[in-house]
Amino acid sequence: MMIERHLRSQFGGGQHAGTGAYMKYVRIPGTAQPRNGRQDSVQKGEKMIKLGIVMDPITSINIKKDSSFAMLLEAQRRGYEIHYMEMNDLYLRKGEGRARTRLLSVEQNYDKWFEFGSEQDIALADLNVVLMRKDPPFDTEFIYATYILERAEEKGTLIVNKPQSLRDCNEKLFTAWFAELTPDTLVTRNAQQIREFWQEHGDIILKPLDGMGGASIFRVKHEDPNLSVIIETLTEHGNFYCMAQNYLPAIKDGDKRVLVVDGEPVPYCLARIPKSGETRGNLAAGGRGEARPLSESDWEIARRVGPALKAKGLIFVGLDIIGDKLTEINVTSPTCIREIEAAFPISITGMLMDAIEKRLA
């Protein structure tokens, strides 16, 4: 009851009236199960959901932090038939998207967290849903995989996230469609334009459009003698675009990852706080994670972006927010489920699987 009172006081009314719907995703203490959520989707008279997942090798994941693993646990709890795939399992034959799959079972066991069952060669359209959870880089191989998945989508398989939207929505450039929510942003490969932007703001962030985990992100302060070489490095002497944004001092309080499930924000986020002397909050760059309830500005940003994400078939998305500014929209393989669920009594994977089942209905 204490947990329920906490969520009601946090989300049950006020400016977020209607968010009492999150109550069904309260987890029973000491378990992974939602208190009021569905216990098993395979009930009498129901057809088993066949779920495929395309991911990096399950042999090398850290199950304590891996969001894909959390999704698999919830899918298994609901009685789904899970088909495991890696990128090299996908192929096209006579215009049909196909794959070599292995049936998969998982458990919360740090010594043995998965077991493969039978192997089969199937049409991807035989699956009800496929989770595309391959981590970046978003390169030509990733793009080719989306075309293969799209062939199954055309025959009725739900792909999470939608293949066309994975191609269309670059995680950094997509913020331009919500410019009123972002820092001042410049995307260019022109060195002079970058210098003028730097002179205007005096303290800027420069980053590539295809990076992840904080790689190749530079802070350039006033009179920094390294500006020219940084521009040359990121643009490869004017041949590639990069992004410039004014520096946000609020980064000291964390780069917040706000998860959005089929247009609806998860009521908690993970703030990635930079280590001393660092600009980047990314956990991969040494940042420290701290789970928090959403702030009013977090809610506002997520509510304004959510409908566009849902319309594009972007069912599971991670917004990056610094202070009250949107900096990135992560669509390829968003993370932080495990960290948030470890800190607060909510089943994010329950929200996701319910959204998937609603779309399949």
Task: Label each PLM-derived region with a short phrase.
Residues I53, L131-M132, Q245:
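Redox-cofactor binding/interface segments in oxidoreductases and associated redox assembly factors
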Residues G37, V54-M55, I61-K64, G277, ...:
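ATP-dependent carboxylate activation and anion-phosphoryl transfer catalytic cores
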Residues T59-V187:
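Conserved N-proximal alpha/beta basic substrate-recognition cap immediately N-terminal to
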Residues R38-K47:
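Short, Lys/Arg-enriched N-terminal segments with co-localized hydrophobic residues
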Residues M1-M2, M23:
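Methionine residue identity
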Residues S68, A191-Q192, Q199-D203, D210-I301, ...:
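Phosphate-binding site of ATP-dependent enzymes
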Residues M48-G52:
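Extreme N-terminal starter segment of soluble prokaryotic enzymes
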Residues L7, A17, M23-V26, G37:
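Short hydrophobic alpha-helical segments enriched in small aliphatic residues
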